[in-house]
Amino acid sequence: MEKFKAVLDLQIKHRSALGYGLVTLLTAGGEKIFSTVVFQCPCTATLNLTYGLVFLLVPALALFLLGYALSARTWRLLTGCCSRSASTRSSSGLRSTLVCAQVSAVAALAPLTWVAVALLGGSFYQCAVSGSTRLASYLCKDRNHSCIAKLPQVPCNKQEAEMQEILSQLKAQSQVLGWVLIAAVIFLLLVFKCVSRCFSPVSYLQLKFWEIYLEKEKQILQSQAAEHATQLARENIRSFFECSKPKECNTPSRKDWQQISALYTFNSKNQFYSMLHKYVSRKEVSSSLHSVEGDVVVPVLGFVDDAAMANTHGV
């Protein structure tokens, strides 16, 4: 039991890194299955380029859109946005843009992994480039005149020595592009991580405390919400069967839910660990949590919206 608890604690502590690792492994495995089982280059001048690019880029686009759909911050941003007042929408426009940029960066991980693994494999690239008329003259340079006509057949005709040479050249180009893409992604991730941490308004240990607080808030909110929902449902059912008036059961209003569902902004003057924390700490019960002077979106605190959305989604 202690070992199981230790593994669970490790998973909670490093769930972000484990999640990214799992996404990368699943994407790489999916690409391998896709390229060996589904992909069959048509080996015709009219279809090779289109077929290869479709297999290379369309799954990447699908993974990118799936990354948006699976992001808690996406639905936090979109839910109810069309029913808000014009003044509220305009005031949160910049914050929404910054959040969209952060969500896009995270959602791009899986598609970039797909493209990189596909380029390392080389099959999609070989098929696409062999059907490109612009690259035909370059690939057939210093070769006989029939090379350009035979080029679309390269992915299918692997027996001829000349075809094998061109195929090896295309695979080498594809793998070089794949490693360049991997290096560029790692470099950009490292730069973004370093810059966001450099401009963090709080210290390293406070960030760790912040994560612990959000985890506990999530657990307690889900527990209290389940208990309150059970109590409300039980009272309504009792009232229905007994034909009596239900007892008053205080439940947060629609405005209250909207307040704690807003995007989190950091303010150095009044520091709160979540929108729920900010809501219960407001000076006046009737006051709103709209953006005030000094509120900013901090990239390193993006996990606050994810955790809070998990709370309300769990509700």
Swiss-Prot record:
The keyword Membrane applies. The chain crosses the membrane at residues 22-37, 47-68, 104-128, 170-192. Residues 38-46, 129-169 are extracellular. One of its GO terms (cellular component) is immunological synapse. Keywords: Cell membrane, Disulfide bond, Ion channel, Ion transport, Membrane, Transmembrane, Transmembrane helix, Transport. Oligomerizes to form decameric and undecameric channels. Belongs to the CALHM family. It comes from the Eukaryota. Its main location: membrane. Disulfide bonds join C41-C127, C43-C156, C140-C147. This is Calcium homeostasis modulator protein 6. The gene is Calhm6. InterPro entries: CALHM (IPR029569). It is found in: Cell membrane. GO terms for biological process: ATP export; regulation of natural killer cell cytokine production. It catalyses: ATP(in) = ATP(out). It is a multi-pass membrane protein. GO terms for molecular function: monoatomic cation channel activity; voltage-gated channel activity. Pore-forming subunit of an ATP-permeable channel. In response to pathogen-derived and proinflammatory stimuli, relocates from intracellular compartments to NK-dendritic cell and NK-macrophage immune synapses where it mediates ATP efflux and NK cell activation involved in antimicrobial and antitumor responses. May assemble to form gap junction channel-like structures with gating and ion conductance likely regulated by membrane lipids and voltage rather than by extracellular calcium levels. Residues 1-21, 69-103, 193-315 are cytoplasmic. Pfam families: Ca_hom_mod.
